[in-house]
UniProtKB/Swiss-Prot annotation:
Biological function: This protein is one of the early assembly proteins of the 50S ribosomal subunit, although it is not seen to bind rRNA by itself. It is important during the early stages of 50S assembly.
Protein name, as recorded: Large ribosomal subunit protein uL13
A cellular component term, taken from the record's GO annotations: cytosolic large ribosomal subunit
Family classification: Belongs to the universal ribosomal protein uL13 family.
Gene: rplM
Phylogenetic classification of the source organism: Bacteria, Bacillati, Cyanobacteriota, Cyanophyceae, Synechococcales
UniProt entry tagged with the keyword Ribonucleoprotein: yes
NCBIfam families named among the record's database cross-references: rplM_bact (TIGR01066)
MF terms (GO), sorted A to Z: mRNA binding; structural constituent of ribosome
Length: 150
């Protein structure tokens, strides 16, 4: 009888990937990035361990949404004070802090526990094409072609 091999954290190889978000559909991009962060693209995937890779997302300011979501989709945050609710549309938040849109979409697709917080730390999002992670030699990650919006 074969035994199931559980990889130890010392044996897990961590790679760095760079993903270009230009003209990509937000949800489809977030799904693939969350899968790589979890390590589901590896044969050594284990649900309760961090076996995933680091992901650098560039051009977050050029991500797209379909339909009327640019004006209808709302992002809410609360300061914790009475009357402290702030509401902002997708278009307004994309003008102000485009990284937050991609981060929030990906974070919602990760586990909502300590493991999810640990996985989220391996995500780096930048609004331009430049990033400071050249020393890690990130490999370009090819997204599914159906994720792009023409």
């Amino acid at each position: 009888m074969n035994k199931t091999v559980v990889p130890s954290l010392n044996t897990v190889e961590r790679h760095w990937y760079v993903v270009d978000a230009e003209n990509q559909c937000l949800g489809r991009l977030a799904t693939e990035v969350a899968s790589v962060l979890r390590g589901k693209n590896k044969p050594t995937y284990t649900p309760h361990l961090d076996t995933g890779d680091f992901v650098v997302v560039i051009n977050a300011d050029k991500v797209k949404v379909t339909g009327n979501k640019a004006s209808d989709k709302l992002y809410r945050r609360h300061s914790g004070r009475p009357g402290g609710m702030k509401v902002e549309t997708f278009a307004a938040l994309q003008q102000r802090i485009p990284e937050r849109i991609v981060e929030k979409a990906i974070k919602g697709m990760l586990p909502h526990n300590a493991l999810g917080r640990q996985l989220f730390r391996k995500l780096k999002v930048y609004k331009g094409a430049e990033h400071p992670h050249g020393a890690q030699q990130p490999q370009p990650y090819q997204l599914n072609p159906s994720a792009s919006i023409k």
